[in-house]
Amino acid sequence: MKVSVIIPALNEEESLPGLLAAIPEEAVNEVIVVDNGSTDRTAVVAQHCGARVVSENFRGYGAACWAGFKATQGEILVFMDGDESFFPVEISKLTAPIIQGEADLVLGSRTLRAEDVQAVPLHARLGNRLVGGLIGVASHVWPTDMGPFRAVRREILERLDMEERTYGWPSEMIIKASKLRCKILEVPVSYRPRTGGKSKVSGNFLGSLKASYCMLKVVARWSLWTPAPPSSSRP
């Protein structure tokens, strides 16, 4: 199965070289960096490092993910941040359950292992717990982490009819996938503070607060969502 990695990036020229160099070629077929209105050399650096660059000028995490999704034809889509806080060598941990037919959506959790939890700031952990609990009430899926490192079948993402264009994208994906009765799996992933640049969410209290508020609104909005029946061709 063709695996495509989509990396939304806003002013990540410092982190991208190390991140892109660490992506295992044997596990990935293509890498797309979505330049989300950067004011630095993000696009130039990404292209120089061999990634395909897509531009999305509407600043928003979901908007960047959507632009990357539309630009690729991969059968498995992996989303990860461009700040080197996650480890590309673990991409196969996310894609393997999908390839083996064990899952449709695999979430990378930074809080399943005690050794990784402390790398996540307290305010981010508290926000994760609150949002994850409300998602559990709404969808009967109880995620331990709302992190962005995840893999999903393309055919599933197409059916989710994603609408959120900001930080609500990860929450919307989980809620809708659960209502489609998708097989959702969490796997532990390693995490570290960003290596360069400025944190927009987890490493920034105001960013975490803003993201959590956005996710809470998303839970309220999509908790009653009903999936459309799959289209069928007429005889």
Regions found by a protein language model. Name each.
Residues K2-S4, E30, E172:
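Cell-envelope/extracellular polymer assembly enzymes that use nucleotide-activated donors
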Residues N36, M80-G82:
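Active-site acidic Asp-centered loop
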Residues L77:
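Short aromatic/hydrophobic "clamp" motif used to bind/position activated sugar donors
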Residues V141, R165, I174-R192:
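Catalytic donor-sugar/metal-binding loop of nucleotide-sugar-dependent glycosyltransferases
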Residues D35-A43:
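A conserved acidic beta->alpha catalytic loop
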Residues N57-R59, A63-A71, V89-Y167, R194-L216, ...:
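Acceptor/aglycone-binding surface of glycosyltransferases and processive sugar-polymer synthases
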Residues I7-G18, G37:
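Active-site beta-to-alpha loop of glycosyltransferases that engages the nucleotide-sugar donor
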Residues A21-N29:
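Short, acidic, metal-binding catalytic loop of nucleotide-sugar glycosyltransferases
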